[in-house]
Amino acid sequence: MYKLSKTTPFFFRRAFLCGRRGGYPESNLSNFGRPTASTLSTSQSSGICETNDYSNKPYFFQVKFEDRFSKKIDKFNECFRHFYYSHGGQQYMDKFESIFDNWEHEFSKTRGFRSPKTFINESDKGIEIRVELPGFSKENVKIDFSNGLLNIDALNKNTTIQQPSSNNQQVESQHQSLMEFKKSIKLPEDIDVSLIKAIMNNGILEISIPKNSYVKSTTINVQ
């Protein structure tokens, strides 16, 4: 157990060496746990050997630092959960998801079919979802709603058969391409599932989801 009076200089000594050299000196590591003649003191009454050299005591402050760091992480997670559930964090997460979808669409390294863009707009009336699905028709798209999730599945298979171009080439070639898209969108609880509408036109899927609060609203005349 280290004394409190020697904890502070040991901390700054270790922090300086680790920060400047990226680790402990080789001399300290090679002599770790070995008391030297200058630092070894023997108690005649008990016969216990003690060393006062703290340069060979690695990772003392690291345990304290990791403990404090984990407490800060727990506090951050608690604040994030409070913000998410109390201040409508779902809409911010939807925005982040839209940004990542755009990045995936722009920087995708795969050739051919790339991840379609998805736009989600929420208002007092309801939710409007727009998905770009080039090369798909309405027969290739399936939409279902379960457990608060709107699931969009699109699958398109194309088979191309190339006939022999000359008498020497008597074997025909066949090429098959597969385009698949799956996405699940978390919807709020105040929506009317029975009034969900989906329209597919020129490779663009538009989904309209009204909210219960807007559908059930009535106008009251003032007399």
Curated annotation (Swiss-Prot):
SUPFAM superfamilies: HSP20-like chaperones. It is found in: Mitochondrion. Disulfide bonds: none annotated. Gene3D superfamilies: 2.60.40.790. The keyword Transit peptide applies. One of its GO terms (molecular function) is unfolded protein binding. Residues 109-223 form the sHSP domain. Belongs to the small heat shock protein (HSP20) family. This is Small heat shock protein hspI, mitochondrial. It comes from Dictyostelium discoideum (Social amoeba). The gene is hspI.
